[in-house]
From Swiss-Prot:
InterPro entries: UBA, UBA-like_sf, UBA_UBXN1, Ubiquitin-like_domsf, UBX_dom. This is UBX domain-containing protein 1. Residues 205-284 form the UBX domain. SMART domains: UBA (SM00165), UBX (SM00166). One of its GO terms (cellular component) is cytoplasm. Residues 1-42 form the UBA domain. Residues 72-114, 129-169 have a biased composition (Basic and acidic residues). Signal peptide: none annotated.
Amino acid sequence: MAECSTLESLIEMGFSPSRAEKALAATGNQGIEPAMDWLVEHEDDPDIDEPSVVVPEDSDSGTTDTQGMDTCEERLPLTEEEKEKQTKRMMELIAQKQKEREEREKRERIEQEKQRRKQGQELSAVKQKIQEQEMQKAVEDRRREKQEEKLARDRVREKIARDKAERARRFGGAGSEPISPPAEASIPATTPSPSSPVQEPPTKKEYDQCRIQVRLLDGSALSQTFRAREQLAAVRLYVELNWPGGAPGPFNLLTSFPRRVFTEEDMEKPLQELGLVPSAVLIVARK
């Protein structure tokens, strides 16, 4: 009778018959409170609504079951006070389990957030390391480029110095002074006869120096005097070394009239051969 009363009480409290039967079987029919505790604790079990397997008790006849059922049917319903008490107990258990579940979920969320932050910090560290490596590589590349540019300028300077030394050796260290012709006193003076006048052929004037003006990108200009036999590379080097604030990058040299863009091959040619003597205006243009 007690078992039947407990089962019906659980059903009256809103539990399904299958859950109520399973709770009583799991708690060994120890009463309504253990059954309610079990129901609240196993509320989220996936198999909570599956029918329980009931092992029939060994009995001499079926009369006992019939009597038990009759007894259940004859049981008086719970009083309002008993229902209220049991309902209150059930609500307290449900509230307690809900609180425990919320606390557990909160701890899980905190742990997940810790893991997320840890992974984010690790990812940020990896990204920062990659950026530092890329920056270091860029610095090394730029340092190597500057070193190569310096070596190239040094080679041009050395070549210019060798050319100057060679000219000094050839012309006896005359420097920028033009070669002096033999003194007129050493040539015997002869008076041409009126009948046979002497006509001297016109002589082409040779220039040993040339004045170069270079117009920069911003409209300003650089001016310098070079030897007529110096290479055009000397002019480019002069521009690179004297450009206010440094050259912004690779550039070409050209003349406007007649228009001519000088190539890398032209850089090895003397100014005299390029037609820039005795003076010329060169224009800087970006490559």
